[in-house]
């Protein structure tokens, strides 16, 4: 906060005027905006070393700086030897956005070559739009019978069938031996089962 001298009355010859001190509220005695570093730099060695954001005043558009800051932090960080495979500390991987060549980019009128709105699609009459064949490959070979191979009037070879009940033989309708407490199998039991099988087989041909 600065102060300045203000005379109370006009000075007279040979008389020293009375002075009154008045307080000035302006910093550094000026009302102008302060010039800070990011946009302004002092005309010293430090200001010439660290240039402001506006760049060098003596270089025009398209001109390179005559002097390079070889000892600067930005230059040293850009020249740090790093690994491109990502094995070491501070390694660099591939470029995130690769430069696109102008020869590869599409030209005007390249898009929408085919107008899909004007196309008329044929309606499908297949259920659920399924037109795939039932069998992927046609069965053509000697192992597959051809037309006329089957004869529906031909009778198959007769086989012995037992009366079934829930997928198993119903032994209540088949002649069986009487149950005994002894689980040992006798020779008479074998003869009985053998005779029962023979009777069932001959009943196919003889009534």
Swiss-Prot record:
Expressed in tissues rich in ciliated cells, such as lung, kidney, vas deferens and testis. Both isoforms 1 and 2 are expressed in testis. GO terms for cellular component: ciliary basal body; cytoplasm; cytoplasmic vesicle; Golgi stack; nucleus; trans-Golgi network. It comes from Mus musculus. Interacts with proteins involved in ciliary transport, including ARL13B, CETN1, KIF3A, RAB6A, RAB8A, TUBB1 and TUBG1. Interacts with AURKA. One of its GO terms (biological process) is embryonic heart tube left/right pattern formation. It is found in: Cytoplasm; Cytoplasmic vesicle. Keywords: Cilium biogenesis/degradation, Cytoplasm, Cytoplasmic vesicle, Golgi apparatus, Nucleus. During primary cilia disassembly, involved in cilia disassembly. Required specifically to control cilia retraction as well as the liberation and duplication of the basal body/centrosome. May act by stimulating AURKA activity at the basal body in a cell cycle-dependent manner. The gene is Cimap3. The keyword Nucleus applies. Its main location: cytoplasm. This is Ciliary microtubule-associated protein 3. It comes from the Eukaryota. GO terms for molecular function: beta-tubulin binding; gamma-tubulin binding; kinesin binding; protein kinase binding; small GTPase binding. InterPro entries: CIMAP3 (IPR033602), SHIPPO-rpt (IPR010736). Pfam families: SHIPPO-rpt (PF07004).
């Amino acid at each position: 906060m600065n102060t300045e001298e203000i005379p109370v009355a006009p000075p007279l010859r040979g008389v020293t005027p009375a002075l009154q001190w008045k307080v000035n509220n302006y910093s550094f005695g000026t009302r102008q905006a302060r010039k800070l570093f990011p946009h302004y730099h002092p005309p010293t060695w430090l200001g010439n070393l660290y240039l402001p954001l506006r760049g060098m005043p003596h270089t025009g558009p398209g001109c390179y700086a005559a002097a390079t800051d070889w000892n600067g932090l930005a230059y040293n960080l850009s020249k740090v030897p790093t690994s491109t495979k990502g094995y070491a500390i501070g390694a660099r991987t591939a470029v995130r956005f690769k430069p696109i060549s102008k020869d590869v980019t599409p030209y005007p009128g390249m898009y929408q070559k085919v107008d899909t709105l004007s196309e008329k699609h044929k309606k499908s009459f297949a259920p659920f739009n399924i037109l795939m064949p039932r069998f992927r490959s046609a069965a053509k070979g000697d192992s597959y019978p051809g037309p006329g191979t089957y004869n529906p009037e031909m009778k198959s070879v007769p086989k012995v069938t037992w009366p079934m009940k829930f997928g198993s033989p119903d032994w209540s309708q088949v002649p069986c031996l009487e149950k005994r407490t002894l689980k040992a199998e006798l020779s008479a039991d074998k003869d009985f089962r053998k005779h029962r099988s023979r009777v069932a087989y001959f009943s196919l041909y003889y009534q």
